Amino acid sequence: MSIRAEEISALIKQQIENYQSEIEVSDVGTVIQVGDGIARAHGLDNVMAGELVEFSNGVMGLAQNLEENNVGIIILGPYTEIREGDEVRRTGRIMQVPVGKELIGRVVNPLGQPVDGLGPINTTNTRPIESPAPGVMDRKSVHEPLQTGIKAIDALVPIGRGQRELIIGDRQTGKTAVALDTIINQKDEDMICIYVAIGQKESTVRNVVETLRKHGALDYTIVVTASASQPAPLLYLAPYAGVTMGEEFMYNGKHVLVVYDDLSKQAAAYRELSLLLRRPPGREAYPGDVFYLHSRLLERAAKLSDARGGGSLTALPFIETQAGDVSAYIPTNVISITDGQIFLQSDLFFSGVRPAIDAGTSVSRVGGSAQIKAMSKVSGTLRLDLASYRELEAFAQFGSDLDKATQAKLNRGARTVEVLKQGLHKPLRVEKQVIILYALTRGFLDDIPVVDITRFEEEFHAWLDSNATDLLSEIRTTKKLADDDKFAAAINGFKKVFVASE
């Protein structure tokens, strides 16, 4: 077979015409130091702050310090396989996490990867973990109540949808229990909940997940966990991953509750990273931008305007105090960022008052606008009455003679404390809260012995379910107080059948 010269020249011409002369340029650096979750790389001249970089073994990192001769990178995964001299390359992307309804009911790490052994999460939607908070004109005043199901909170320090309410207290004072009860109470409220566990023990997170599953709350909850065994970069990123997953729902007109348990551990992880990156330490060795760490996170909680869909994202950040010291650096920072705080006292907790909410120092800066009309009417003076009772109680311990008015205040105060006690994982519907608080504030409980108050309340709720369903549904639908006669008839009707202890 003869090959003609014309064919050969035509083929060569075609090859020349189709030749692609584009060169793929990728910015590559070299690892010069690695350890403790931090790497320093030389040669990434054009890398951006916060950009994702990829090491030669596939582990990702986040560029943080851009210095004259090197780049400080926090490593998002195991760093033991990374060696000095390894290649590290830019990706041109910032960090994103998967979002969407496919995550609901799952337990994921801060990178959005499932850790519950239930298989992959089939979602293609992602959002950047750092995004600007909604602007002033995109927001609306907080006006819808978020019912926690906890009498002491819904009556004394009400939380609204889109609010940021700090839960602060020493370790072992019931902070997590408050959050779990709130999540459990959202069952029929069309609310998506996100529980972010930062630096918790794996066993604790397991217990939380099982509690949520047992009460049917995992059907509308995402659990994001960065446990104590994880490297510091994941603890630092966990809250941002949680709020990003929540924002996807908020911008689609849904209502979201995000619990950060707890931000003290995130601040400690960020301090660790900052010191390893050789950033100058400030007060309590925290870096200078630790306020911005929390403010840019909590500002992303909002109640959106109707034009933006009317969705909301409510934040419940936790801060752990040392021996009740709320004047430390991180507690004062977060108190100044949030719209109020619920202060849990260890003294109250160990004396059997649970939830151990200190009415004197707890405050909600949204207040009555986050309560239904019925609740704001029955709980109007409750907080002041409770605070004055605490003062009188201390005074009465001296055993001096008390006048009738003071004695009456002490008696009412003792009953108030008993009514506000609540069992673990037993959230109460708002209409039942209204009726028992009405009975308390209008003096219907003054003749019930203090030791019987808790039993009276439990039996009263059961009696209401079978004998006063009309009253319950009226409060639920109108959100206003029914006629005094209806309340009196229901309360007196039950008092006739209630048997007080001797």
UniProtKB/Swiss-Prot annotation:
Q: How does it assemble?
A: F-type ATPases have 2 components, CF(1) - the catalytic core - and CF(0) - the membrane proton channel. CF(1) has five subunits: alpha(3), beta(3), gamma(1), delta(1), epsilon(1). CF(0) has three main subunits: a(1), b(2) and c(9-12). The alpha and beta chains form an alternating ring which encloses part of the gamma chain. CF(1) is attached to CF(0) by a central stalk formed by the gamma and epsilon chains, while a peripheral stalk is formed by the delta and b chains.
Q: Mind telling me which InterPro entries this protein's record contains? A: ATP_synth_asu-like_sf, ATP_synth_asu_C, ATP_synth_asu_C_sf, ATP_synth_F1_a_nt-bd_dom, ATP_synth_F1_asu, ATPase_a/bsu_AS, ATPase_F1/V1/A1_a/bsu_N, ATPase_F1/V1/A1_a/bsu_N_sf
Keyword RNA-binding assigned to the entry: answer is no
Keyword Ion transport among UniProt keywords:
yes
The protein's job, in short, is: Produces ATP from ADP in the presence of a proton gradient across the membrane. The alpha chain is a regulatory subunit.
CDD domains on file: ATP-synt_F1_alpha_C, ATP-synt_F1_alpha_N, F1-ATPase_alpha_CD
What HAMAP family does UniProt report for this protein, alphabetically? Answer: ATP_synth_alpha_bact (MF_01346)
- Binding-site residues for ATP, renumbered to this chain: 169-176
Q: What protein family does this chain belong to?
A: Belongs to the ATPase alpha/beta chains family.
Residue ranges, annotated region (Disordered)? 115-135
Q: Indicate the annotated site residue(s) for Required for activity.
A: 362
Organism domain of life: Bacteria
**Gene3D superfamilies in the record:** 2.40.30.20, ATP synthase alpha/beta chain, C-terminal domain, P-loop containing nucleotide triphosphate hydrolases
Recorded GO MF terms: ADP binding; ATP binding; proton-transporting ATP synthase activity, rotational mechanism
Q: Which Pfam families match?
A: ATP-synt_ab (PF00006), ATP-synt_ab_C (PF00306), ATP-synt_ab_N (PF02874)
Reactions catalysed, semicolon-separated, are: ATP + H2O + 4 H(+)(in) = ADP + phosphate + 5 H(+)(out)
* Membrane topology recorded in Swiss-Prot or TrEMBL: Peripheral membrane protein
Q: Which organism is it from?
A: Bacillus mycoides (strain KBAB4)
Question: Under which name does UniProt file this protein?
Answer: ATP synthase subunit alpha
Naming one, the record's GO cellular component terms include: proton-transporting ATP synthase complex
